[in-house]
UniProtKB/Swiss-Prot annotation:
This is Aminodeoxychorismate synthase component 1. Pathway: Cofactor biosynthesis; tetrahydrofolate biosynthesis; 4-aminobenzoate from chorismate: step 1/2. It comes from Escherichia coli (strain K12). GO terms for molecular function: 4-amino-4-deoxychorismate synthase activity; magnesium ion binding; protein heterodimerization activity; tryptophan binding. L-tryptophan binds at S36, Y43, S44, R45, F46, P240, F241, S242. Disruption phenotype: Cells lacking this gene do not produce 4-aminobenzoate. It catalyses: chorismate + L-glutamine = 4-amino-4-deoxychorismate + L-glutamate. Its EC number is 2.6.1.85. One of its GO terms (cellular component) is aminodeoxychorismate synthase complex. Disulfide bonds: none annotated. The active site is at E258, K274. Monomer. Heterodimer consisting of two non-identical subunits: a glutamine amidotransferase subunit (PabA) and a aminodeoxychorismate synthase subunit (PabB).
Amino acid sequence: MKTLSPAVITLLWRQDAAEFYFSRLSHLPWAMLLHSGYADHPYSRFDIVVAEPICTLTTFGKETVVSESEKRTTTTDDPLQVLQQVLDRADIRPTHNEDLPFQGGALGLFGYDLGRRFESLPEIAEQDIVLPDMAVGIYDWALIVDHQRHTVSLLSHNDVNARRAWLESQQFSPQEDFTLTSDWQSNMTREQYGEKFRQVQEYLHSGDCYQVNLAQRFHATYSGDEWQAFLQLNQANRAPFSAFLRLEQGAILSLSPERFILCDNSEIQTRPIKGTLPRLPDPQEDSKQAVKLANSAKDRAENLMIVDLMRNDIGRVAVAGSVKVPELFVVEPFPAVHHLVSTITAQLPEQLHASDLLRAAFPGGSITGAPKVRAMEIIDELEPQRRNAWCGSIGYLSFCGNMDTSITIRTLTAINGQIFCSAGGGIVADSQEEAEYQETFDKVNRILKQLEK
C-alpha cells in the first residue's frame, strides 16, 4: 500500500476560489463541488472541487456499473462493498492531514433509495426520476479551499503541475440564465396530506412506530443553467453542507444544513437535526422563537428518539463503549429557520472502513423516523414517489480513511427540464396536522421563492 501523500501546490487565495474554478467545470459530467456556504458555522471550513474522475460507480436498483477508462463492469454485489474494493484497488493510503480532509478518493451521491440494498423494503412508491441510487466518482486530484487558514490547495496523486495547467486552461462559457417556466406544484393536495397524516397517526397509536417523517414534493419546469441557480441559492442560504453535482443524467443542488456522519482519523461524529421553527424578522421575537424551540417538549422528544436511533446505528460498528452524546438539544440559527441539533460521537475500530460505518447508519434516522425500517416501510406506502437523491447523502470517502457526508435535505434535483424539491417533518403521537403541514413550507419556501425571481 502506497502511503505517499499527494503532491500539493498552493494557489492564490480568494474567498470565492471554489466557485471561480468550478464555474469553468460546472458543465462537465462528474464535476462536483462540496461547499461550506460561507456560513457562520463551526463546520463551514472547507470547500472541495473535483472533476474528471479516474473511475465512476453508478447504481440503478440491483446493478452497479464500474467504469474505468474503456472498461465497464456490472455487478449485483453490495454497492458500498464494491466502492470499498475500488478504493482498496487504488492502493493509495496517505497519512491523515487535518488541513486536507479529502486527499483524493470517492466523492458523490448516495441517494435515499440506496437504502433498499441494505434493508428489505416494499416497492409501492413510483420511481419517476431516472437518476442513479448511487453516483460516485473516484478522483486522484482535488482543489481544497480552507476558509479558516485562507488557503487554496491543489492536490494530485499524478502530475500536479499538469493538473494546474488543465484547471487554468478551462474556459468559462456563458450559459443561459436559469428560469422557472411554470409555477411550483405539490405532489399532494392539502386534503391528501391530511389523509396521510391521519394514517401515520393510526400507525403511531397502534404502537407500530413512534415517529415517521412524512414529506410532500414540489415540482416545476425550467430552462437554463442549473449552476446559475445554485450560485443564487448558495449565496442566500448559507448552508454549511451545500453541494452541486453534475451527473450524466442531470444536476443535484443541495443547500443542506445537516451533517450526516463525519469520520476524521477514526473519530466519528453525527449531528441529527430534529425540531424546526421559522426565523422572525424582529430580533427580540426571533430570540423568543429560539427559546421556544429549545423548551419544546415535543421537539425534544422527537430529537431524543433520533439520537437514540443514531446511537444504536453507530453502535453497530463503533468501538464498544465509545458512543457518547456531548451535545443534546442545541438551537442553531439558519437564514430561514431555527433547528434543534444534537451531537453523537464514537470511535471507529481499526479493522473497519468508513464505508462500513456509512452502511450501518444509512439512510440517516433524522429523515426516516423510528424504528427506522418500519418508518421507511410506511414512507414507501404513503409518499407517492420515491425520494431518490432527497434524504440520502452527499459526501466523500477519502483515500486517507476520512469521510464526511451530509443529509440531502433542502436539496433540488434537476433533470430533463424538470426540477424537484421535497420537504417533510417528523410526526409523533402528539403532532398537530396543521403545524406539521406548515413546517414543510417553512423549510423550503425560501428556496422555492428565490428561484421564482
